[in-house]
From Swiss-Prot:
Active site: 103
EC code: 5.3.1.6
Protein known as: Ribose-5-phosphate isomerase A
SUPFAM superfamilies named in the record: D-ribose-5-phosphate isomerase (RpiA), lid domain, NagB/RpiA/CoA transferase-like
Database matches in NCBIfam families: PRK00702.1, rpiA
Residues the entry annotates as binding substrate: 28-31, 81-84, 94-97, 121
PANTHER family to which the protein is assigned, alphabetical: RIBOSE-5-PHOSPHATE ISOMERASE (PTHR11934:SF0)
Listed pathway(s): Carbohydrate degradation; pentose phosphate pathway; D-ribose 5-phosphate from D-ribulose 5-phosphate (non-oxidative stage): step 1/1
Quaternary structure, from the entry: Homodimer.
Keyword hit for Isomerase: yes
Amino acid sequence: MDQLSMKKMAAQAALQYVKPDSIIGVGSGSTVNCFIEVLGTIKETIKGAVAASKASEELLLRQGIEVFSANDVSGLDIYVDGADEINPQKMMIKGGGAALTREKIVAALAKKFICIVDSSKQVDVLGSTFALPIEVIPMARSQVARKLVALGGSPEYRENVVTDNGNVILDVYNFKIMNPIEMEKELNNVAGVVTNGIFALRSADIVIVGTPEGTKIIE
C-alpha cells in the first residue's frame, strides 16, 4: 500500500471523532489535506472549522466549510493534525509546512488533539529522521542560529519560505531529542524564537496510524 493510501485511511478514521454541530480545529499538511477532503462529505453536520494555516483555510472554503478565526472561539472539541515524526509518548515534531506556530495556537484551544499519520512517521526518538523546524523573527536569524550551534544543532535557513506570520524558518539537524518537554521549553526561551516544532507540552491524545495492514488507533 502506498503512502497516500495510508494517509487517506488515517484521515477517514478521524471522522469518527467529529461531533455534530461542532467547530473542528484543523492543522495543515498533506495528511490534513486528506482529512479536509473527507470532512467535506459531512460538512452539513458541523458548524465549521478553525484553520492553522492559510493553505488549509483555502481548502476548507473550497469544500464549502465555514472558517472561523481562533479569536472567534473559546474552545474546540478536537484538533486534527498530522506530524513529521511522532514518538511512543505521542510527542511530535511538526513544522515541515512552516505552520507550527498557528498549529500550536489551535491545538491549545482543543480538548483533544488527534494526530493522523502514516506509519513512516513513527520513531522511537524525535529528531531521528526529520530536522526540527524553528520559527524565528527575521532580525534574530543569525543570533538564534549561533545559539542552536552552541546547543549542538546544525541549523539551516529554509530559503524562500516566509511563514503566515511573516517570519523565517531554521531547520535544525543533528538534534536527538531525548527529553522533548525540556528541549521545547529551552528553545522557546531563546530570544527571537517564536516557537519550535516540538509538540511535547501539548502532545497528541489520540494517534491514528495508517499502516499497510489497516488503521491503528493509539489512545
